[in-house]
């Protein structure tokens, strides 16, 4: 009887857990702007921080086996345009060498919103961060709520959210 109860309980718990949404790769490529970033080590994403970047474009290479990411970094107020290629590991998890080793996962994508979860290892510490991107220059209240939910699920503090679009004065 105990075994039947435990089996039933296990089945209910498994059923109640949210199934991760499937990523539609056709929605990944395009013109994207970073709206928000959050990190457990906020120093990495504050203005002048090494991981504060301003996305412009993401392209899929070979059916998203690699991602070409075009973005700006600011160096003493000067916008530097860079393009880096991230190589797919599994699912929608990619590895990119930039200010350390970065494991980047596309965790949500819709018509107007894309969210990445990044773990950056700089040789000393792993920083967990999320990046909330939009096709425009803002999130709807529902998109912001979704972004905050994804932060919570990944252990990234919502109080560390930085509004990057406010400081994005780099060329389109």
From Swiss-Prot:
Pfam families: Lipocalin. Disulfide bonds join 60-64, 79-170. The keyword Signal applies. One of its GO terms (cellular component) is extracellular space. Residues 1-16 form the signal peptide. The modification Pyrrolidone carboxylic acid is found at residue 17. Found exclusively in skin. Produced in sweat glands and transported to the skin surface. The keyword Transport applies. GO terms for molecular function: odorant binding; small molecule binding. Belongs to the calycin superfamily. Lipocalin family. Probable pheromone carrier. This is Allergen Bos d 2. It comes from Bos taurus (Bovine).
């Amino acid at each position: 009887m105990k075994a039947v109860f435990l089996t039933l309980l296990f089945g209910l718990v498994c059923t109640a857990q949210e199934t991760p949404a499937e990523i539609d790769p056709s929605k990944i490529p395009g013109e994207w702007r970073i709206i928000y970033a959050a990190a457990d080590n906020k120093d990495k994403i504050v203005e002048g921080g090494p991981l504060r970047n301003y996305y412009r474009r993401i392209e899929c290479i070979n059916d998203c086996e690699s991602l070409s990411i075009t973005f700006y970094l600011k160096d003493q107020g000067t916008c530097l345009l860079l393009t880096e290629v991230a190589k797919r590991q599994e699912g929608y998890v990619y590895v990119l060498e930039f200010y350390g080793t970065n494991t980047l996962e596309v965790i949500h994508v819709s018509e107007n919103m894309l969210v990445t979860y990044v773990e950056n290892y700089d040789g000393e510490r792993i920083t967990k961060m999320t990046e909330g991107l939009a096709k425009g220059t803002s999130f709807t209240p529902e998109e912001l709520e979704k972004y905050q939910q994804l932060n919570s699920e990944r252990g990234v503090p919502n109080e560390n959210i930085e509004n990057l679009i406010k400081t994005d004065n780099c060329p389109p």
